[in-house]
Amino acid sequence: MPATYAHYRFGTQMLTGMPADVRRTAKRYRRLFDVGLQGPDLFFYYRPVVSTKIGRLGSKFHRQTGKEFFSRICRNLRLEPREEGLAYLYGALCHYALDAKCHPLIEKLSREGIANHIQIETAFDRFLMELDGKTDVRLAKHLTLTDPECGVVSRFYPGAEPKHVRESLKGMANIRRALELPEGPMRTMVTKTIGLGSRTFRDMAAGKELDAVCRELNQPLLERYRQAAKDFPEQVIQLGAHFAYNAPLGEEFTPIFG
């Protein structure tokens, strides 16, 4: 999972070039599209201090190929076509497109021992924000859904119920709010408290000293990001055709989320 900002940024950029009908649907159900941009990552935030069956769904679905994930979802949506589901579908496609391109490199860099997976993604998020000239990005507001919308999302993930989606999003939004606090004593206290329960969130809250360690990794990741953007229009076309008349998904959907 490139981190939250990278996925939000990528999806927002890709939305402008999507076919007009897809763009209208995404804008009409923008909350679902925005949450779709985070893909299965939301389950990592379900009661993260302990291992749970729901929390493990994040890893389970990241091990699926694009063909597995999107074929199953499209079969489901054809049985009960709903525009809300399509909005989430295309958000999730954005998530997959970026994950599938970036994760192999992130795993390689992590194995080389410079920094771990989460640290690399955290530093890359900050790099992108600096590239965009942003110092104060509020993403928690994009992580809220109504109860019926949680029901839409749960259809994408066998084993999850609407209540699980709701609690996962609440956890994700709370973590984001903590990470969005300005540098100072309050942020230090809150992030240290979060880090007590999870190494992952401790890495997400790492200070700017991490940026220097990961600086040399950002450019190769940015190249993967740009390649994902270049390949995305073809993925949109293929997914639309697959949903509409079960056209086969190509090799672009062979990689796993990672």
Mark where each language-model region is.
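N-terminal leader/auxiliary helical segments
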Residues: 1-93, 97-258
